[in-house]
């Protein structure tokens, strides 16, 4: 589960690069939305991995 958390975090960083860096100005809005989605998925996956690891 922590592997998925890291993958989501990396995807979120890439989305932030495109969204906040001005590289893809036309798709900045979409990239910002994707960034937030993947950050949420990262946090959920991280939490899930920590909780599942204790069981």
Swiss-Prot record:
Residue ranges of the TM segments: 5-25, 33-53
The places in or outside the cell where this protein is found are: Cell membrane
Q: Which domain of life is it from?
A: Bacteria
> Could you tell me which InterPro entries the record lists for this protein?
DUF1328 (IPR009760)
Query: What is the membrane topology here?
Result: Multi-pass membrane protein
Q: Write one Pfam family the protein is assigned to.
A: DUF1328
- UniProt entry keywords in alphabetical sequence: Cell membrane, Membrane, Plasmid, Transmembrane, Transmembrane helix
Q: What's a single GO CC term here?
A: plasma membrane
Family membership noted in the UniProt record: Belongs to the UPF0391 family.
What is this protein's name?
Answer: UPF0391 membrane protein RSp1666
Source organism per entry reads Ralstonia nicotianae (strain ATCC BAA-1114 / GMI1000) (Ralstonia solanacearum)
């Amino acid at each position: 589960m922590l592997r998925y958390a890291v993958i989501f975090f990396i995807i979120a960083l890439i989305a932030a690069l495109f969204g906040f860096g001005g590289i893809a100005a036309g798709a900045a809005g979409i990239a910002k939305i994707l960034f937030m989605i993947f950050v949420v998925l990262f946090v959920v996956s991280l939490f899930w991995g920590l909780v599942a690891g204790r069981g």
